[in-house]
Amino acid sequence: ITNSEYRQFVNWVRDSIIRTQLADMAEQTGQTSGSGGIGDFAYLDTNTEKMNAYQQYLQNTYGDQKARKLNKKKALIWDTNKYPDEYYSEVMDKMYLPEEEAYNGKRIMDVQKFEFKYQWLDMEKAARARGKRKDFIKEEIVKVYPDTTVWIRDFNYSYNEPMHNDYFWHEAYGDYPVVGVSWIQAKAFCEWRTLNKNAYQKSKGDYTVN
């Protein structure tokens, strides 16, 4: 897997977390789409009249979270000078490291918050034991950002600080293999790829993959 491919995963996780927090804040503050502020990032199902029958069923049966849809058509705003309101600013501020951890006056995102959650079915245990299917469904929460410190930690006698700083993000290394990804992170990446593939298959009316 290349840096570019894994970077897509990291960015997707980052953006999904931000969009979810923006939608939650919009709901908490009563902001709705069209307000020009954080309301433009509200959950799409805020207007129940626009929900299809299946979404209405999910909401009525399982609660809001099963039917919630993020507004991914609205581009995220990264320029602090263009933040639409204080609520948006509050959400974005929480995604960055605190001021006291800023380096050379520049704050960076707290990559420890980039977490991907997924579920999987433990088929081996399910085959050996009796029980309900839900008893064998496992949930994983994985921090997805690669450990870039391996460049310094694993090469004691080399000057690898530039690689630590640039290797994962610089476009010049986009087609190079990703470094610092654990087995757990690799499995999470594969789950995400399957998720994307199934979304594409579903949009075409094709069978999904396991």
Model-derived segments and spans:
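Extended beta-strand/loop cores of jelly-roll/beta-sandwich
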Residues: I1-N210
